[in-house]
UniProtKB/Swiss-Prot annotation:
Function: Involved in the catabolism of oxalate and in the adapatation to low pH via the induction of the oxalate-dependent acid tolerance response (ATR). Catalyzes the transfer of the CoA moiety from formyl-CoA to oxalate.
HAMAP family reported in the protein's UniProt record: Formyl_CoA_transfer
Catalytic activity entry: formyl-CoA + oxalate = oxalyl-CoA + formate
Keyword Transferase: yes
Record: active site: D168 (nucleophile)
Regions annotated as coiled coil: none
A Gene Ontology biological process term: oxalate catabolic process
Gene3D superfamilies linked to this entry: Crotonobetainyl-coa:carnitine coa-transferase, domain 1, formyl-coa transferase, domain 3
Name this protein carries in UniProt: Formyl-CoA:oxalate CoA-transferase
Pathway as given in its UniProt record: Metabolic intermediate degradation; oxalate degradation; CO(2) and formate from oxalate: step 1/2
EC number(s) per entry: 2.8.3.16
Binding site for substrate: G247, G248, Q249
């Protein structure tokens, strides 16, 4: 079966997490992703957070599936020639270098366009144009500068970053959409273009509901926040609201049976207005259906703490899965707090390919997250990440059409090997 992006060739200069997230997704959809790596070193994450000695780390393997690896010294004259040929034959160049790195390599946008006018150059940066555009950005910096940290945590505590990698992986997903959109536009224009995704912008996009709340705040208190019911005044900016729901439907994380010893024995419970009477039945508070302080959503806002305290009395008598089974029968929105161990062992996630087991030649079997997007006509077959330089000769011969003699010349030039250090005097 053909894949959605069959025939699309990606020149992948990305590293660490944000860029590899993007190119891995494109590879899962069938693009031929050629990962260009520094000879002898490769992507820095190959050696970061290693759990086993002398093998590629899970940090690397889980972000670089379905790709091919070529090692290339782009400072070497022969290496520059090879890179020029790759630019000629590829559709997209993806990079997450610091500002100006491509220019210093000798391949600014104008030169790339002269080599291949159809090439799309896609970049991830920390910030867009402005006072911070030259600053180095990592995941947590992006969360802090994009509005996520200031609105995450509890009101009386410090800002918090989230466990979800919304800065790195989130921006990578944004860039992938931009690339596919640019490829589609190229079918009508016939030319390439630049695609840029800034990490600050990506995080802000994912926290847009907080920008919504910032504007609402100018017209009065945010009544769905628990501090409204507690009579605590709001300040000038959207506050941290703990586990209050951000969608206008009051919700909290509540303890379940076993919470004293299990750090994840909790459930998220939403008191959705259409099922309020069912909630009253479940927790055995039938009078709340008609009580003036509880019957209407607006009236309940001032009593959320006492309402959820009563609901928690009920959830603490059930395991999180027992509570979920009961609540689902009444169509009450809820969800158990699932640990990474529980997710890794969930058979339904294995069945859908959301969690996959991958065989690797040096580290053996490991688990990874598969493609979260399912296409009926382009199913994803997750293949292991490449070893460093594993496909170098294959790419030189099959993609660029070099002869054995030409490949030997490139090897002899040192373009595929670590730069030689000068001998000590």
């Amino acid at each position: 079966m053909t894949k959605a992006l069959d025939g699309v060739r990606i020149l992948d200069f990305t590293h660490v997490q944000s860029g590899p997230t993007c190119t891995q997704l494109l590879a899962w959809f069938g693009a031929d992703v050629i990962k260009v790596e520094r000879p002898g070193v490769g992507d820095i994450t190959r050696g970061q957070l290693q759990d086993l000695p002398n093998v590629d780390s899970l940090y690397f393997t889980m972000l670089n599936h379905n790709k091919r690896s070529i090692t290339l010294d782009t400072k070497n004259p022969k290496g520059k020639e090879v890179l020029t040929e790759l630019i000629k034959t590829c559709d997209v160049l993806v990079e997450n270098f610091g500002p100006g790195v491509l220019d210093r390599m000798g391949f600014p946008w104008e030169k790339i366009q002269s080599i291949n006018p159809k090439m799309i150059v896609a970049s991830i940066k920390g910030f867009g144009p402005g006072p911070y555009e030259d600053c180095k950005v990592y995941e947590n910096v992006a969360q802090c500068t994009g509005g996520a940290a200031s609105t995450t945590g509890f009101r009386d505590g410090p800002p918090l970053v989230t466990g979800a990698q919304i800065g790195d992986s989130g921006t990578g997903l944004h860039l992938a959409l931009g690339i596919v959109t640019a490829l589609y536009q190229r079918t009508t224009t016939g030319r390439g273009q630049r695609v840029t995704a800034a990490m600050q912008d990506g995080v802000l996009n994912l926290t847009r509901v907080k920008l919504r709340d910032q504007q609402r705040l100018a017209h009065g208190p945010l009544k769905e926040f628990s501090q409204f019911g507690e009579g605590i005044p709001f300040g000038e900016a959207v506050p941290r609201a703990g586990n209050d729901s951000g969608g206008g439907q009051p919700g909290r994380i509540l303890k379940c049976k076993g919470w004293q010893t299990d750090p994840n024995a909790y459930i998220y419970f939403i008191t959705q207005a259409p099922v309020w009477e069912k909630i009253c039945d479940v927790i055995n508070e039938p009078d709340w259906k008609t009580h003036a302080e509880y019957a209407k959503p607006a009236a309940r806002l001032k009593h959320l703490n006492s309402i959820f305290a009563r609901i928690e009395e009920w959830t603490m008598t059930k395991t999180k899965f027992e509570a979920m089974d009961i609540l689902n029968e009444y169509d009450i929105p809820c969800g158990p707090i699932l640990s990474m161990k529980e997710l890794a062992e969930d058979p339904s996630l294995r069945a859908t390919g959301t969690v996959v087991e991958v065989e690797h030649p040096t580290r053996g079997k490991y688990l990874s997250v598969g493609n979260p997007i399912k296409l009926s006509d382009s199913p994803t077959d997750v293949q292991r990440s490449p070893l460093l330089g594993e496909h170098t000769d294959e790419i030189l011969r099959q993609v660029l059409g070099f002869s054995d003699h030409q490949v030997a010349e490139i090897h002899d030039s040192g373009a595929l090997d670590p730069p030689r250090k000068a001998a000590a005097e």
